[in-house]
């Protein structure tokens, strides 16, 4: 039975050098998928890009193909309502994501092509500063997200935040991770170098 303590064990493996950054993200997203009970789970980091603020996917596991799949940056300019809700509430809870005000922008290019119906994204912080999000997605039919699932994602973020910071900075091609200042949540401080997107051609945030 999946347990949130599995997250601590995965973080410990990274801290002890038993797994590298890529394997850490794979194991973490697989564990999140199991714990939340959804087929897709990912980790996104706040970054600054030439087009403005964005979220960058560092790993996303899809149980339907049993592997990590890629994604392009999710840009605030293209997904304003989503970012506004995420910043204001610390989460986006969209059981009917195709018609939810924060996520309907993703319907044509992302949700419908991938048969996704529900989205649950929860922010996590490092030292009190928003650093990224955990994203869970339900396929096949809508899912009403429970308070237990929302709280579970928050617990995962709390337990994994420092390991996520270390993993984000461990890659030789990655600069210090992007943080939103608590006093000015719209301003980004630094920018990780881009990660190459993989096979997922349909994506959020580019239209």
Where are these regions (language model features)?
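GAF sensory/regulatory domain recognition
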Residues: 30, 43-74, 78
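Amphipathic alpha-helical "output/dimerization" segments
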Residues: 126, 144-165
């Amino acid at each position: 039975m999946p347990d949130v303590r599995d997250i601590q064990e995965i973080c410990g493996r990274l801290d002890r050098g038993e797994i590298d950054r890529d394997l850490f993200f794979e194991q973490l997203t697989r564990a999140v998928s199991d714990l939340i009970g959804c087929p897709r789970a990912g980790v996104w980091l706040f970054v600054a890009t030439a087009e403005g603020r964005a979220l960058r996917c560092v790993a996303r596991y899809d149980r339907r193909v049993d592997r990590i799949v890629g994604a392009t940056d999710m840009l605030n300019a293209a997904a304003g309502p989503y970012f506004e809700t995420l910043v204001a509430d610390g989460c986006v809870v969209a059981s009917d994501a195709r018609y939810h005000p924060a996520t309907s922008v993703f319907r044509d290019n992302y949700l419908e092509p991938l048969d996704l119906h529900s989205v649950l994204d929860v922010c996590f912080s490092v030292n009190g500063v928003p650093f990224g999000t955990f994203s869970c997605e339900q396929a096949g039919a809508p899912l009403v997200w429970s308070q237990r699932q929302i709280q579970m994602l928050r617990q995962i973020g709390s337990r994994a935040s420092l390991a996520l910071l270390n993993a984000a900075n461990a890659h030789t091609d990655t600069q210090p991770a992007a943080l939103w200042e608590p006093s000015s949540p719209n301003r980004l401080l630094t920018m990780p170098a881009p990660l190459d997107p993989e096979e997922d051609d349909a994506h959020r945030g580019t239209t």
